[in-house]
């Protein structure tokens, strides 16, 4: 039996997703819980290995096991801190959560004070479609051509939410796009300059810096023909926890805004 699990976590409590020696990671926390529960498994895979500080509402992992207890989220949730399993689906044995994904949806949260949302929306149109995102990512050897399907921006409760959807993303790509939208909306980064950068015309020393990881949330990963059974109790528990913890991010983002604007003026 192969299962896909929807997981949420507070990324500020970990040193990233991927297991590393001597530090706490999301993958390490899940594997430890599986071991403590005595659940034997194989072929463990993840959809997205988020960076340190980045949280998730809807990341997905998959594993193969004959232990039916995996279908009860509380078996692992009771053994983990800062990670919550809230959805499960039985999937084909060759299912890979990263390669089978249609799109990923990220949300970034910013304090709305001083934000020109109308201008941010205008700037966001420049990123739609297929471009070279080397100026808006931390290059790691992968092909830098990527496609953005959708960007939506709205304000709610004194917070600006930037939602970005696409097939796949480069390292720090979403966070750097958010930085560019903020700078563009405030007149620091011209739209013409963004177009040039998306065509590969930029100085490496003048790349747009990434927004802080604490404001980024991997909201969802979409699949065809994969129906997750939702555990509402686990989902609500995560939602309560993350709202309290994200309150701190508002002050961090305000500090980031001051720093990035001053950096551009130096």
Swiss-Prot record:
> By what name is this protein known?
tRNA pseudouridine synthase A
Alphabetical keyword list: Isomerase, tRNA processing
Q: Does the keyword Ligase apply?
A: no
What does the record give as the reaction this protein catalyses?
A: uridine(38/39/40) in tRNA = pseudouridine(38/39/40) in tRNA
Is S-adenosyl-L-methionine one of the keywords? no
Organism from which the protein derives: Pyrococcus furiosus (strain ATCC 43587 / DSM 3638 / JCM 8422 / Vc1)
* Gene from which this protein is expressed: truA
Residues in the active site?
Answer: 51
Role according to the record:
Formation of pseudouridine at positions 38, 39 and 40 in the anticodon stem and loop of transfer RNAs.
Tell me the enzyme class.
isomerase
């Amino acid at each position: 039996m192969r299962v896909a699990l929807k997981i949420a976590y507070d990324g500020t409590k970990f040193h990233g997703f991927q297991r590393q020696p001597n530090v706490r990671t999301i993958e390490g926390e899940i594997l430890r819980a599986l071991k403590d529960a005595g659940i034997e498994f194989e072929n463990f895979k993840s959809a997205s290995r988020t960076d340190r500080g980045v949280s998730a509402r809807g990341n997905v992992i998959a594993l193969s096991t004959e232990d039916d207890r995996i279908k009860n989220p509380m078996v692992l949730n009771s053994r983990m801190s800062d990670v919550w399993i809230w959805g499960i689906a039985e999937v084909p044995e060759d299912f890979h959560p990263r390669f089978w994904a249609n799109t990923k949806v990220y949300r970034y949260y910013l304090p709305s004070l001083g934000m020109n949302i109308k201008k941010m929306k205008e700037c966001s149109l420049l990123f739609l479609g297929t471009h070279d995102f080397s100026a808006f990512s931390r290059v790691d050897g992968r092909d830098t051509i990527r496609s953005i399907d959708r960007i939506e921006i709205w304000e709610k409760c004194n917070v600006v939410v930037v939602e970005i959807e696409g097939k796949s993303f480069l390292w720090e790509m979403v966070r750097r796009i958010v930085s560019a939208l903020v700078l563009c909306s405030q007149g620091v980064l011209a739209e013409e300059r963004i177009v040039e950068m998306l065509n590969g015309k930029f100085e490496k020393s003048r790349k747009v810096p990434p927004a802080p990881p604490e404001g980024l949330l991997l909201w969802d990963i979409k699949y065809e023909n994969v129906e997750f059974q939702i555990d509402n109790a686990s989902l609500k528990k995560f939602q309560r926890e993350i709202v309290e913890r994200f309150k701190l991010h508002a002050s961090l983002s305000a500090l980031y805004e001051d720093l990035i604007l001053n950096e551009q003026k130096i």
